[in-house]
């Protein structure tokens, strides 16, 4: 039997499918998620149910978003899960997670995310951060390092700034390739994202912050002065106390927000 087949399902490369099979890792992730009935529990990419089954055991209802029609069909006929699941068949990148919110109940979102869409999916989920209590995701280890990086690190970039603007980022555990079927070619890790109820550095317009970060990190080896010359002048960098000869990975989240707010003020 092919090592891409697990529980009768062949992993689909185009969906980035790698199924978690290590019981100890599963237990640790479920413990970190801490499922309960006081939140709207949401799983992205339930796959063959490695996390779905133990989480569903602990709650009355679990909402799942799954793209693969074959896996959706399996979930609809699952002898235990079918009565507890609310299943949305579709692309999580296009899904309106806001429709799942219930007055007085924030979401706990989790999943073993397809590595080929993890970064754009993070950006999509940040749009719903105010309705989310916690997020726990299995990701490529490299992505977790980027999420949790500090200024000056090679991994520090646009994803770092936006993630840490919206959330406290906490790496939970590292997961080796042999914990999956088929085994991915990269190491994996679980991360906890805790959206801020009150942001430490409020931005006047997140769209401006996002654009500024994209522009700054577009050419990482060039200076801020070079990359942002159409957005901020040398005098404005000086007003902010930011050395414009620095490279984008040397600038803190607080400083990126300050730059974005100055751009907003100029537009007003």
Swiss-Prot record:
Entry-linked CDD domains: AdoMet_MTases
Task: Check the record and name the InterPro entries matching this protein.
Answer: KsgA/Erm (IPR001737), rRNA_Ade_diMease-like_C (IPR023165), rRNA_Ade_Mease_Trfase_CS (IPR020596), rRNA_Ade_methylase_Trfase_N (IPR020598), rRNA_adenine_dimethylase (IPR011530), SAM-dependent_MTases_sf (IPR029063)
Q: What UniProt keywords are attached to this protein's entry?
A: Cytoplasm, Methyltransferase, RNA-binding, rRNA processing, S-adenosyl-L-methionine, Transferase
GO terms for cellular component? cytosol
What is a single molecular function from GO for this protein? 16S rRNA (adenine(1518)-N(6)/adenine(1519)-N(6))-dimethyltransferase activity
Q: Which reaction does it catalyse?
A: adenosine(1518)/adenosine(1519) in 16S rRNA + 4 S-adenosyl-L-methionine = N(6)-dimethyladenosine(1518)/N(6)-dimethyladenosine(1519) in 16S rRNA + 4 S-adenosyl-L-homocysteine + 4 H(+)
Localization of this protein = Cytoplasm
Q: Name the residues that bind S-adenosyl-L-methionine.
A: 18, 20, 45, 66, 91, 112
* One Pfam family here: RrnaAD
- Primary location: cytoplasm
Its transmembrane ranges are none
Q: Which SUPFAM superfamilies match?
A: S-adenosyl-L-methionine-dependent methyltransferases (SSF53335)
Cross-referenced NCBIfam families? ksgA
Family in the record: Belongs to the class I-like SAM-binding methyltransferase superfamily. rRNA adenine N(6)-methyltransferase family. RsmA subfamily.
* HAMAP family the UniProt entry points to: 16SrRNA_methyltr_A
Functional description taken from the UniProt entry: Specifically dimethylates two adjacent adenosines (A1518 and A1519) in the loop of a conserved hairpin near the 3'-end of 16S rRNA in the 30S particle. May play a critical role in biogenesis of 30S subunits.
User: What's the protein here called?
Assistant: Ribosomal RNA small subunit methyltransferase A
Which species is the source of this protein? Shewanella baltica (strain OS155 / ATCC BAA-1091)
What gene, per UniProt, encodes this protein? rsmA
């Amino acid at each position: 039997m092919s090592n891409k087949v697990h529980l009768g399902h062949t992993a689909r490369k185009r969906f980035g499918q790698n199924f978690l099979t290590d019981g100890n890792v599963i237990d640790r992730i479920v413990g970190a998620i801490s499922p309960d009935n006081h939140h709207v529990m949401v799983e992205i990419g339930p796959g063959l149910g490695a996390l779905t089954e133990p989480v569903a055991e602990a709650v009355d209802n679990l909402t799942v978003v799954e793209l693969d029609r074959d896996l959706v069909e399996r979930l609809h006929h699952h002898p235990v899960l079918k009565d507890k699941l609310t299943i949305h068949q579709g692309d999580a990148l296009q899904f309106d997670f806001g429709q799942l919110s219930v007055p007085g109940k924030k979401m706990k979102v989790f999943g073993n995310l397809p590595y080929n869409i993890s970064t754009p999916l993070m950006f999509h989920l940040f749009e719903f951060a105010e309705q989310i209590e916690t997020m726990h995701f299995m990701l490529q280890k490299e992505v977790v390092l980027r999420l949790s990086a500090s200024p000056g690190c090679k991994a520090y970039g646009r994803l770092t700034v936006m993630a840490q603007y919206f959330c406290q980022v906490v790496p939970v555990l590292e997961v080796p390739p042999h914990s999956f079927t088929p085994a991915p070619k990269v190491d994996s890790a679980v991360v906890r994202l805790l959206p801020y109820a009150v942001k430490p550095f409020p931005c006047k317009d997140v769209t401006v912050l996002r654009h500024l970060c994209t522009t700054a990190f577009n050419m990482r080896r060039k200076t801020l002065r070079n990359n942002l010359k159409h957005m901020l002048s040398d005098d404005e960098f000086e007003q902010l106390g930011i050395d414009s000869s620095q490279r984008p990975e040397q600038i803190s989240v607080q400083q990126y927000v300050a730059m974005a707010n100055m751009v907003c003020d100029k537009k007003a």
